[in-house]
Design a protein with these regions (language model features):
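Cross-family detector of peptidyl-prolyl cis-trans isomerase
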Residues: 3-9, 16-140
């Protein structure tokens, strides 16, 4: 009975904290995804099946940038949330953001490119960090 009470208390705490978004808040998900709200947006909220437009910068554990929409000649990236068109860490980490918001996502390998990595840019089993800014949400 005490074990159930503990788990219920933990669940209630998580639900409470999930509703208290503020700048600098860090959430560590059970799957290892770390979400840090850098700026809380005030626009539309991104949900599954919405088309979203983001600016992003991706870095490896050593801090080296492997990709960015902000590089010279870069453009914002558009994708449909929650349909698997991007790595799982993005689908999970962008969901719930509001337009104008910025998040730092630290994505473990199994929610990124896993054992295979990606070309010669992302090594196998790499933890990735993305700073993502939500620019637009289009509801279908």
């Amino acid at each position: 009975m005490m074990k159930i009470s503990y788990h219920l208390s933990l669940l209630c705490s998580f639900i409470y904290l999930a509703g208290c978004q503020k700048n600098g808040e860090i959430i560590i998900m059970g799957n290892g995804l770390v979400i840090e709200d850098l700026v809380i947006g005030e626009g539309s909220e991104a949900q599954d099946y919405n088309k979203v437009v983001v600016n992003y910068t991706g870095t490896l554990e050593d801090g080296s940038i492997f990709d960015s929409s902000l590089k010279p000649g870069g453009t914002p990236f558009t994708f449909t949330l929650g349909v698997g068109s991007v790595i799982k860490g993005w689908d999970l980490g962008v969901k719930g953001m509001k337009v104008g918001g910025k998040r730092k996502l630290t994505i473990p390998a199994d929610l990124g490119y896993g054992n295979n990595g990606a070309g010669n840019v992302i090594p196998p089993n790499a933890t990735l960090t993305f700073e993502v800014e939500l620019l637009e949400v289009e509801v279908y």
